[in-house]
């Protein structure tokens, strides 16, 4: 390969793969060893390794095909499924390089070792782990583990939780709307918040101005703390109730509730249990499709197997029982679920005490509320709750159960007493997923006896006028595979006084035609207060015009009602930049009424997401009116390292820092780049879950070298976790080294260049070539091997080229270094 070709190839390779580990001072090791041998006649087969991951300061001259001992960043596969990337120590045993895996590390990978092996390197073979293999060329570690040793891999301990930084941060939103250039409406929302250890103080204030009328309002103030070991969340102050039994209300008081985010899906989500009876010693095989998820031997008698999310992905299960005589029995287990249903043995609760806000209670009365969900065996969940306040009491109980092919059913009965009014509420729900038919059926029926009062109704003194009598809703959905999707929804609501009775039905069909996506909809609505039925037909067509640049799409919609009103709209919309941070939309609408009146409206809007906030503007106008709208949405974070102007922070977020380097893309959220001081805010993380913070390496400038582009955090609820990526700014150079006697340092010689606290490291190849990155200014590079050392200086002139260049250097040995 020509030198120019090699340089270009290495540039591309570097930008794609070079993420050295500066945390362990393993930066800039010579991955050039992969590439340069293509043009040499020596060492082409003896050496094949990724030298980025050699241990820091490892003084090793390569003289055999056996890789060196030390720590390597490897991809770990459990039963051929990638679980994580981690730094693992390796040592030589016999003629192999083997990993040192402690009992704690195996446990973090979801592998249970039920022995007292507390050695630094556990005896995996004695623990029952059948096979461990290391593919050095790709740095992949494969571990084959029997099913009985596997646990929930995503399980997290309290020591893994990051409570984040101490911070004072503000979210703000500013809106202005102008109508006909004279009527003005302004809205400002400010949320000053404090994070201190695991405590969260949250506030929100709003300002509204409608022409000359101005109002300030405080929405809420509350203090929150999570207790991971107890799986509960504490809130003191103004907040909203949270319940699986009752509707939600605003209140001032104290709330203690189970935080379901603290559980893994397999710990909390309902999954079926397999039950049966074996006539003799039998083999039980449970399959999902062609995959065996249970293969166990059982004695004669009843048996039961819980299905965990680790193995089960939802859907129909096939059970096969084979007795000692070879006789087989087979049956199918279908399952469905409802939101109220929980894992067998799990209890979820909410307890609240305080005062209702005046919009729910005329006098801000004291109230208390509690509810419990408990997952039982035999695929059912029991739940119930209570509410009481001044002159009011409500008691509720219910069950949700999975009846197999007929679906999941819920029955809930509540009884209320308010002053002299008594009543009850019955709710029946059903959810069936007919997976063999790619269809789903859901219905919800409510009946209320007159006199039943909800907690929100006591503010109206239990007014029985316009009380709900019954409601019924039905939803059908069917996938037609390549022919699209069909759905039908029906709703009927009836009141005791018949004042607001209504019936509605809609039929929707979605399909694709070539590149176009087409949705048709027919709806029928009947309201008690209107004699005439409202019938509407609509069609919407969306056609992508390009995906290579700008992601531009056109759209057309038409709607016609039996009232004589027809509306049509045509437009084009799109986005610019790879992360779609600049969006735009242009629409032209036309409405024709039965009296012959026609209204034409034009609309144009744009939105830009920057590192410092999201800014929006729009204009709409017709021959009779015009409207302008402007909005700014963002945040300010004050922390120990300074001030960061960011996008609006979500409930849980991450503050990323890359040493004073701007314009580096972080994650997938549009507009999230490092700002002028190297900070960027990732606004939305999942609390108590593993979140990966990823830098988009395609946007990293050539003169920036990052120690790592991916880190993982597990934040507590409401936390702002700080994630720091070490970076070096400087040029990349290939040095051609010779010693004073005309020879070259041997293959595997280690080079070091110290720049402040950073240490750049490289490895010399078999032709005396040394690759270094992140070099700036001037300095001295030391090269060591087998107790010997030589050094050479470099200057700004050597590193001035923006392209990867070759610089010849003589590496001189100090006089006292010996030969």
From Swiss-Prot:
Its Gene Ontology cellular component terms are: cell outer membrane
* Superkingdom of origin organism: Bacteria
Pfam families per record: PapC_C (PF13953), PapC_N (PF13954), Usher (PF00577)
Classify the main location.
Answer: membrane
Q: How does it sit in the membrane?
A: Multi-pass membrane protein
What's any GO biological process attached to this entry?
Answer: pilus assembly
Does this UniProt record's set of keywords contain Aminoacyl-tRNA synthetase? no
Q: What does this protein do?
A: Involved in the export and assembly of C6 fimbrial subunits across the outer membrane.
The record's comment on protein family reads:
Belongs to the fimbrial export usher family.
Its name, as the record gives it, is: Outer membrane usher protein CssD
Classification from the root reads: Bacteria, Pseudomonadati, Pseudomonadota, Gammaproteobacteria, Enterobacterales
């Amino acid at each position: 390969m020509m030198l120019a070709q090699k340089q270009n190839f290495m540039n591309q390779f570097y930008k794609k793969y070079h993420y050295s580990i500066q945390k362990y001072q393993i930066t800039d090791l010579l991955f050039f060893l992969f590439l340069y041998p293509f043009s040499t006649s020596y060492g082409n087969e003896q050496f094949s390794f990724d030298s980025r991951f050699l241990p820091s300061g490892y003084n090793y001259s390569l003289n055999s095909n056996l890789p060196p001992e030390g720590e390597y960043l490897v991809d770990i596969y459990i039963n051929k499924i990638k679980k994580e990337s981690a730094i693992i120590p390796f040592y030589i045993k016999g003629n192999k390089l083997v990993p040192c895996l402690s009992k704690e590390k195996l446990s973090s990978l979801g592998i249970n070792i039920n022995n007292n092996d507390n050695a630094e390197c556990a005896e995996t073979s004695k623990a029952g782990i059948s096979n461990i293999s290391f593919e050095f060329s790709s740095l992949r570690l494969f571990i084959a583990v029997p099913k009985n040793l596997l646990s929930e891999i995503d399980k997290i301990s309290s020591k893994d939780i990051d409570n984040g930084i101490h911070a004072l941060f503000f979210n703000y939103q500013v809106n202005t709307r102008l109508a006909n250039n004279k009527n003005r409406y302004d809205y400002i929302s400010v949320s000053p918040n404090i994070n201190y250890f695991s405590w969260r103080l949250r506030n929100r204030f709003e300002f509204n101005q409608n022409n000359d009328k101005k109002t300030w309002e405080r929405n809420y103030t509350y203090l929150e703390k999570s207790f991971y070991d107890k799986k509960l969340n504490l809130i003191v102050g103004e907040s909203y109730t949270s319940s699986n039994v009752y509707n939600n209300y605003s209140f001032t008081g104290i709330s203690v509730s189970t935080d379901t985010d603290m559980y893994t899906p397999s710990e909390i989500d309902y999954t079926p249990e397999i039950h049966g009876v074996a006539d003799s010693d039998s083999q039980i095989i449970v399959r999902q499709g062609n995959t065996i998820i249970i293969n166990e031997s059982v004695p004669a008698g009843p048996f039961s197997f819980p299905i965990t999310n680790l193995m089960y992905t939802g859907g129909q299960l096939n059970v096969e029982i084979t007795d000692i005589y070879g006789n087989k029995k087979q049956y199918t287990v279908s399952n469905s679920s409802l939101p109220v249903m929980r894992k067998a043995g799990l209890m979820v609760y909410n307890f609240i005490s305080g005062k209702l806000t005046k919009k729910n209670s005329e006098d801000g009365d004291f109230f208390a509320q509690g509810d419990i969900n408990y997952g039982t065996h035999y695929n059912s969940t029991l739940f119930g709750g209570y509410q009481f306040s001044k002159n009011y009491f409500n008691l509720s109980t219910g069950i949700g159960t999975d009846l197999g092919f007929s679906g999941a059913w819920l029955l809930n009965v509540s009884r209320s007493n308010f002053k002299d009014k008594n009543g009850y509420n019955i709710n029946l729900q059903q959810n069936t997923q007919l997976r063999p038919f790619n269809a789903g059926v859901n219905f919800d029926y409510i009946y209320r006896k007159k006199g039943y009062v909800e907690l929100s109704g006591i503010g109206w003194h239990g007014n029985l006028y316009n009380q709900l009598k019954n409601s019924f809703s039905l939803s059908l959905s069917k996938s037609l595979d390549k022919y699209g999707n069909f759905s039908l929804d029906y709703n009927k609501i009836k009141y005791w006084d018949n004042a607001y009775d209504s019936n509605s039905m809609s039929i929707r069909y979605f399909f694709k035609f070539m590149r176009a996506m087409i949705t048709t909809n027919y709806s029928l609505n009947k309201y008690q207060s209107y004699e005439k039925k409202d019938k509407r037909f609509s069609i919407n067509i969306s056609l992508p015009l390009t995906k290579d640049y700008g992601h531009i799409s056109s759209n057309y919609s038409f709607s016609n009602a039996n009232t004589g009103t027809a509306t049509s709209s045509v437009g084009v919309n799109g986005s610019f930049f790879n992360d779609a941070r600049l969006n735009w939309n242009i629409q032209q609408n036309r409405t024709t009424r039965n009296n012959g009146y026609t209204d034409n409206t034009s609309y144009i809007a744009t939105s830009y997401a920057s590192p410092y906030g999201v800014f929006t503007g729009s204009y709409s106008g017709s021959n009779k009116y015009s409207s302008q709208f402007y909005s700014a949405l963002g945040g300010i974070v004050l922390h120990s390292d300074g001030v960061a102007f960011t996008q609006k922070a979500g409930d849980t977020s991450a503050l990323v820092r890359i040493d004073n380097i701007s314009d580096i893309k972080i994650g997938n959220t549009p507009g999230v780049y490092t700002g002028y001081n190297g900070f960027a805010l990732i606004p939305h993380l999942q609390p108590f879950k593993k979140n990966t913070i990823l830098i988009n390496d395609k946007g990293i400038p050539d003169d920036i070298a990052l120690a790592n582009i991916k880190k993982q955090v597990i934040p507590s609820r409401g936390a702002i976790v700080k994630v720091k990526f070490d970076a070096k700014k400087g040029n990349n150079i290939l040095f051609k080294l010779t010693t004073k006697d005309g020879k070259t340092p041997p293959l595997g010689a280690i080079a070091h260049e110290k720049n402040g606290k950073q240490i750049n490291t490289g490895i010399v190849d078999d032709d005396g070539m040394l690759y270094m990155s992140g070099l700036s200014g001037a300095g001295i590079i030391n090269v060591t091997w087998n107790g010997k050392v030589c050094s050479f200086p470099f200057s700004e002139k050597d590193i001035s080229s923006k392209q990867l260049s070759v610089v010849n250097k003589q590496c001189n040995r100090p006089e006292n270094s010996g030969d």
